[in-house]
Curated annotation (Swiss-Prot):
<dbReference type="GO" id="GO:0006310">
    <property type="term" value="P:DNA recombination"/>
</dbReference>
<feature type="active site">
    <location>
        <position position="306"/>
    </location>
</feature>
<feature type="domain" description="Core-binding (CB)">
    <location>
        <begin position="16"/>
        <end position="121"/>
    </location>
</feature>
<dbReference type="Pfam" id="PF02899">
    <property type="entry name" value="Phage_int_SAM_1"/>
</dbReference>
<keyword id="KW-0229">DNA integration</keyword>
<feature type="active site">
    <location>
        <position position="234"/>
    </location>
</feature>
<feature type="active site">
    <location>
        <position position="210"/>
    </location>
</feature>
<dbReference type="InterPro" id="IPR010998">
    <property type="entry name" value="Integrase_recombinase_N"/>
</dbReference>
<keyword id="KW-0238">DNA-binding</keyword>
<dbReference type="GO" id="GO:0003677">
    <property type="term" value="F:DNA binding"/>
</dbReference>
<feature type="domain" description="Tyr recombinase">
    <location>
        <begin position="169"/>
        <end position="354"/>
    </location>
</feature>
<keyword id="KW-0233">DNA recombination</keyword>
<dbReference type="Pfam" id="PF00589">
    <property type="entry name" value="Phage_integrase"/>
</dbReference>
<feature type="active site" description="O-(3'-phospho-DNA)-tyrosine intermediate">
    <location>
        <position position="341"/>
    </location>
</feature>
<dbReference type="GO" id="GO:0051301">
    <property type="term" value="P:cell division"/>
</dbReference>
<keyword id="KW-0132">Cell division</keyword>
<dbReference type="GO" id="GO:0009037">
    <property type="term" value="F:tyrosine-based site-specific recombinase activity"/>
</dbReference>
Amino acid sequence: MKRELLLEKIEEYKSLMPWFVLEYYQSKLSVPYSFTTLYEYLKEYKRFFNWLIDSGISDADDIASIHIKTLENLTKKDMESFVLYLRERPSLNTYSKKQGVSQTTINRTLSALSSLYKYLTEEVEGPDGEPYFYRNVMKKISTKKKKETLAARAENIKQKLFLGDETMKFLDYVENEYEVKLSNRAKSSFYKNKERDLAIIALLLSSGVRLSEAVNLDLKDINLKRMVIDVTRKGGQRDSVNMASFARPYLENYLSIRNKRYKAEKQDVALFLTEYRGVPNRIDASSIEKMVAKYSQDFKIRVTPHKLRHTLATRLYDATKSQVLVSHQLGHASTQVTDLYTHIVNDEQKNALDNL
């Protein structure tokens, strides 16, 4: 979703919310939570508050009128009834006969509610310096995680990674082969953004940064001489991230045409730009997701920018066998998250089995 539309939707949801959710929203902006995360959370709150009214737990006439005492007094049984409602309610998708929402959606809903309850019971300070209330019913509600071993998850992800020489083959395909099947009209659009698209893909594949980190890069954040970018990690921490040298020519090509192609002026500080009717803007996450999906599907298999992050992490682990190094590259505080890559790179285990 484009940033302008996203902010418009956020304002629409905010206009429906009770005062304590608006306080929560303002607080999380300072963390900072991304607008995308806050948008998803507001959607979940609307769903939950509508249920409170429809089920008779709240006698409010509308969402904005829901009293904070209603949240304080919710019982474990109430929350379990809400989860059951999510599991069994008719699907809103007219093309599906499946009842209820997925476990992933339920987990996201519970995560959003846990965040709100933590704010209300621990983080906020009322006039007396204390939280609004102390009873956090969400601590009694557990989420059901998908049962899947790391090995099974790794095998599933592995099919969607561009490992070995496929990293460079993918870039070469976008640069030299993708355009062959395009119409003249499609070629015109492709040529306009070719250098930029290649630079973005190369940056993701060479650094493993998150999509949001790439989107928020400014010109001042990139040092091609040292092949380093400065990014804002989750939680607002600044970090310097190394890039593999294969990305340099793609980034140099883009920077050489950036100002003229996208009509960039001094005030246009964003690294990656899009241009519409002569006005340059920072490219948004949705545009990059669509771009990566388009090229990757034509090359081999449709993937997301996050799979390009997995690609870099897997290749780096394969080359170094160091989970610490990989976790530092990805911006993780713990090596636990990188356990996945040890299972993707499991040739030694397979070779041992072959020798039995």
